[in-house]
Amino acid sequence: MAQDDKGKKLRRSCVESFVGLSDELKAQLYQCVLLINDAYETIYDPSDLNRVVEDVCIRIMKECSKLGALCGLFTDINMFNLFCFFRASRMRTKGAAGYNVPCAEASQGIIRILTERILFCTEKAFLTAACSGVSLPPAICKLLHEIYTEMKAKCLGAWRRLVCNRRPIMILTSSLLKLYNTYDTAGLLSEQSRALCLLVFQPVYLPRIMAPLEIMTKGQLAPENFYSITGSAEKRRPITTGKVTGLSYPGSGLMPESLILPILEPGLLPASMVDLSDVLAKPAVILSAPALSQFVISKPHPNMPHTVSIIPFNPSGTDPAFISTWQAASQNMVYNTSTAPLKPATGSSQTVSVKAVAQGAVITATTVPQAMPARGTGGELPVMSASTPARDQVAACFVAENTGDSPDNPSSFLTSCHPCDPNTVIVAQQFQPPQCVTLLQVTCAPSSTPPPDSTVRAPVVQLPTVVPLPASAFLPALAQPEASGEELPGGHDGDQGVPCRDSTAAATAAEATTPKRKQRSKERSSKKRKALTVPEADTTPSTTTPGTSLGSITTPQDVHATDVATSEGPSEAQPPLLSLPPPLDVDQSLFALLDEAGPETWDVGSPLSPTDDALLSSILQGLYQLDTPPPLRSPSPASFGPESPADIPSPSGGEYTQLQPVRATSATPANEVQESGTLYQLHQWRNYFRD
């Protein structure tokens, strides 16, 4: 098996996914798919390829007809699987062979037709069974619902994803076939349930699939709305709203258009026809019909029972009788209000073709034929001329006969028609299908007054102007008390800048309306000027240990003298300034300062530890807008708070004037080296304000 598959684009095991088919037919399907793959490299006659595909489809339908009441569903799914293989061969080929391989080029649209058919028929089975009083086995309903879910997801997605999840669908179909045979052998399926499956799951009309292939053979393209059972080319996604919409997964509220729009597919029951209790009252008529028969059910009048037309399967081609009967039952009916019933024309009957039926010829049938004539045998249908007055363009209804139902001939009520019976309602029917079905039309009378101004004007958003301040002007501004009238930096919303003691920074903050580019250039120049005016450090040797070069950090006395000397403005009314360290470099942060100094500098016994505490205290005061610098060191941790977290009082909402550190949650092991005091306090404050 593996040697036979070598060098081929399809494995032999792939065709084993077909359900209910013989090994001989699976081998023929494998050769057919290989032929389609080779058609992209070797030129074949498109008509010959179409004949091969048609022969394969007919054999699939005939073998599926032996699978019981669900033969129509198994036929659609097997054809869906076949055209998925055709589309896969098209996607593997980079070059477009166009009209030389019609079955592969049209496979995308045919897959959509089959997918929408399976979705519609599966939902139709649940609705019709509930409305007709027919019970289906729960296990079969569960498998049908899983297939319904897969097909619904395909109809809601893009066209290119129609082939996805092919293998799970075929596995579900195989399980459904085995379960159905088990129930049927055990006699657990009633006659009504089997008749219901035959009426709902009707096999696909074969010319519906072969028509686009014949069109492509002639070098043309089928219209886009042909590849849908609703006749719609656009894929819409109507959203349903309700209380149960959001109970399932996202997107489950979307409804495919095949479940909303009117159905224009031959062989499918109308969407509004859900109560078939009168038809299922005599299921023997449905069960005794030939295999793969099409059932056309109509209801000429609300007070009359349903009428059923049985059209046997015709594999030779298009069946005019089926098309005419289906169109007669699918179109809208206009009731004739005349008192005297109109008789159909019998002497001036004419022959009609499929083209004439499509152009709007009105058919008047007197009986339902037992066997439809094959194509080319000269079968004729009595019709009326299109030039006949509208009063004579009526069609007789197929009404069940009340007498004459014998057990030997159970379908006698289908073969009787009495158009002249007074109890028969004559209806006029239009057989031309509408090109565009209008679901809703909204009209309004023109108003004499001019329409109001409906221009949507969005409100203008006012964003505050944020003026970043340099770090050189940030730390000295902390020493200015609140009583002087100056604002503290940070935490204020508005378009105005934050005043500070530095004249350059104050000028930068005042120009709040300056353009951004000009503002940035002024900030850079301000930073350069402040970098040049750094106070000169003392040249006398200090007693600091090696590695304690901390930039511009000096003693508190030097800081106080520098601040007093450089102060501007009315200094007489200002209180004495606090002793603060000089500002840090512009491009230097606290963590960079720690990395540069090294761990040996931040020791508890270091001479610069008071200066470090003052620096950290000023930073914390500026970050959290405190009135006074918070104390960092205390003789005992027990004096700052309660022993247990339960005793910690909740914040009252007011401003804190003095911060209290939080005790560490875990003690440091005795065998490990104690962390530095300042860094330990910094981590404590960070954890405190983070919580």
Curated annotation (Swiss-Prot):
Changing residue 367 to A: About 70% loss of interaction with host PARP1. Residues 655-677 have a biased composition (Polar residues). It catalyses: S-ubiquitinyl-[E2 ubiquitin-conjugating enzyme]-L-cysteine + [acceptor protein]-L-lysine = [E2 ubiquitin-conjugating enzyme]-L-cysteine + N(6)-ubiquitinyl-[acceptor protein]-L-lysine. Residues 504-513, 539-556 have a biased composition (Low complexity). It is an enzyme of class 2 (transferase). The keyword Glycoprotein applies. Belongs to the herpesviridae TAF50 family. This is Replication and transcription activator. The lineage of its organism: Viruses, Duplodnaviria, Heunggongvirae, Peploviricota, Herviviricetes. The gene is ORF50.
